Regions:
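Conserved N-terminal catalytic core of the sugar/cofactor nucleotidyltransferase
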Residues: 2-5, 13, 27, 31-104, ...
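Short, high-confidence coil segments that cap the C-terminus of an alpha-helix
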Residues: 47, 97, 124-125, 201
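Anionic-ligand binding region
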Residues: 127-129, 135-159
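Conserved donor-nucleotide/metal-binding helix-loop-beta segment in metal-dependent transferases, i.e.
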Residues: 111-139
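Catalytic-core segments of class I nucleotidyltransferases/pyrophosphorylases
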Residues: 101, 108, 117-121, 148-238
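A structural signal for short hydrophobic beta-strand segments in well-ordered beta-sheet cores
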Residues: 25, 142-144, 205
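N-terminal nucleotide-binding beta1-loop-alpha1 segment
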Residues: 1-19, 202
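Active-site metal-binding loops of divalent metal-dependent hydrolases
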Residues: 10, 105-107, 133
Length: 238
């Protein structure tokens, strides 16, 4: 199996930082965030190759410079036309594969990729998405009765009414043919492709359970969630 890391995008949410370096290079303990993702993926023996998609003609060149001439990582120029276009760029890289892992670089999580793969196969799904059903809130809550606060709850762990989808996917290679059939410049993987497949019962979910997750969009976000990031890296075994 090959793991594809999407490290392109304009990093709009991470501005002004992403005007100077890509979000993949957000620093964590002196190393870029993408390095933790790469090392974690390589800890699974069934992942034979890591491919990083980014704009190497722009800020993404910093990623390539960081890794230098490493032979165990392949660098593919992004399409500048969204996730769908990026996946079309790697079609030939998947020639001998039946499935692949897709990881958006700003997702930091010790999701058990082995168990996720088992879910993917057991459900005979076209796609499997990492999800979570609970999260720790960033603000305090209160129990209110008749306008009077009876009790405070400091940043509680809340059960979500709907499962939250994370940016980590396991996909059949045939997904690329479905993207081609759309014949449109911008293809949103979730809403243009997976939405249709979900109606056919072909999209499964892998709950990350007690594993933590953070959307690492900027250095500010990482700094604000420093304890959480440290916990995730420990869960990753790094």
């Amino acid at each position: 199996m090959k793991a594809i890391i999407l490290a392109g995008g304009k990093g709009t949410r991470g501005k002004p930082y992403t005007e100077y370096f890509p979000k993949a290079m957000n620093p964590i303990n002196g190393k870029p965030m993408i390095d933790y993702v790469v090392r974690y993926l390589k800890s699974f023996n069934f992942i034979k190759e890591v491919i990083i998609i980014s704009d190497y003609n722009g800020l993404g060149g910093q990623i390539k410079n960081y890794y230098g001439d490493r032979k165990d990582i392949k660098f593919i120029q992004d399409s500048q036309s969204g996730t769908g276009g990026d996946l079309l760029h790697i079609e030939k890289e998947l020639k001998n594969e039946s499935e692949f892992l897709l990881w958006f670089v700003d997702n930091l999580c010790a999701v058990d990729v082995k168990k996720m793969r088992e879910t993917f196969k057991e459900k005979n799904s076209f796609a499997c998405i990492a999800t979570r059903t609970k999260r720790k809130e960033e603000t305090g809550f209160a129990i209110v009765e008749n306008g009077i606060i009876k009790k405070f709850k400091e940043k509680p762990i809340m059960k979500l009414q709907l499962s939250e989808c994370l940016g980590i996917y396991m996909l059949r290679k045939e997904i690329i043919q479905k993207i081609k059939k759309k014949k449109q410049k911008q293809v949103n993987l979730s809403f243009d492709i997976l939405q249709e497949l979900s109606k056919e019962g072909k999209v499964s979910a892998h709950d990350i359970a007690d594993k933590e997750w953070v959307d690492a969009e900027s250095p500010m976000m990482l700094e604000r969630n420093k304890k959480l990031v440290t916990k995730i890296i420990k869960q990753m075994g790094l």
